[in-house]
């Protein structure tokens, strides 16, 4: 009898369905995650540190879908239905009935640890916790929660609505049913998942960010200008955008955080962040979001800054 009950409980967990998703962070990644979840028919609660930020996130989602309607990529009925499914949540207590809570805050380990420490007590026992981190150890983040076995990395690519890939990363304690539930969730969103082990920056950013960092070194050492480097990689390597333009799009602070995680986590000098990247971040030149990075966006059309 005890065996039958255990099997039933395990099967119940394996078929755990995600119907309601909490998203912590209403910025670029968070609002993108909220958008794709709502379009997939899921109810979404979006949380951030202020109502103004949550309202801005809602406006961004609405604007993005309105543009898709204008292009014929989305029906007005689907846009309205998705917007009706996204609500704001002022406090972590409001996320208590979510089946999955996705953290999409800034790429700062201390910030994420504080979020998970505060969040865990308010969630129902069956709820999964996921992080959208692009570089931080899943095992370390899971350790501050009350459910490391129900914790997983679900790393979306930017921009979330357009990019097909999602990385799934298990921590050392992540159970099989958590992984299978996360995999089914990603499939419901119409995206493709790939599995990475819990190493710094996982797969995509371990390959991508050193390339961007090397492009910044190429600029720093005077090998080529911003325009020359980006043109070379667009036309010579068939990249859709140059590495410096891509760095601005990602955010130079995020690029630096990932390179620091690689450098510290793997202890290899080849991952040392370029001093020019450090200087730009110190200056507050973070790319498109601050309207200045390797390009100046303040006058409209991007102008190379070096």
Q: Residues of each region from the PLM?
A:
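Rossmann-fold dinucleotide-binding core
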Residues: 128-197, 202-206
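A non-catalytic, amphipathic alpha-helix used as a structural packing/dimerization or gating element
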Residues: 52-63, 177-188, 231, 235
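Hydrophobic/aromatic beta-strand patches that form the interior of the parallel beta-sheet core
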Residues: 45, 87, 102, 152-154, ...
């Amino acid at each position: 009898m005890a065996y039958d009950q255990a099997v039933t409980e395990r099967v119940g967990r394996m078929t755990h369905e995600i119907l309601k998703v909490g998203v912590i962070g209403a910025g670029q990644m968070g609002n993108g995650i909220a958008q794709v979840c709502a379009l997939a028919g899921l109810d979404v609660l979006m949380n951030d540190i202020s109502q103004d930020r949550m309202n801005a996130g809602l406006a961004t989602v609405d604007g993005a879908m309105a543009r898709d309607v204008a292009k014929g990529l989305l029906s007005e009925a689907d846009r309205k239905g998705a917007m009706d499914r996204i609500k704001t949540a002022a406090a972590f207590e409001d996320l208590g009935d979510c089946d999955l809570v996705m953290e999409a805050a800034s790429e700062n380990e201390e910030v994420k640890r504080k979020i998970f420490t505060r969040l865990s007590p308010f969630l129902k026992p069956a709820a999964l916790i996921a992080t959208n981190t692009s570089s931080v150890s899943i095992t370390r983040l899971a350790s501050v929660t009350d459910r490391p076995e129900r914790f997983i990395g679900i790393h979306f690519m930017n921009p979330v609505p357009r990019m097909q890939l999602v990385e799934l990363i298990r921590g050392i304690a992540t159970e099989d049913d958590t992984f299978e539930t996360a995999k089914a969730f990603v499939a419901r969103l119409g995206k493709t998942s790939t599995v990475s082990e819990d190493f710094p920056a996982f797969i995509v950013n371990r390959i991508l960010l050193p390339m961007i960092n090397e492009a910044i070194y190429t600029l720093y050492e005077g090998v080529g200008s911003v325009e020359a480097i980006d043109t070379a990689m667009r036309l010579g390597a068939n990249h859709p955008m140059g590495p410096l333009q891509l760095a601005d799009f990602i955010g130079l602070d995020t690029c630096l955080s990932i390179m620091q995680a690689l450098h510290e986590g793997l202890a290899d000098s080849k991952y040392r962040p370029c001093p020019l990247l450090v200087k730009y971040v110190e200056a507050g030149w973070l790319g498109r979001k601050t309207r200045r990075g390797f390009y100046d966006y303040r006058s409209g059309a991007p102008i190379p800054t070096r």
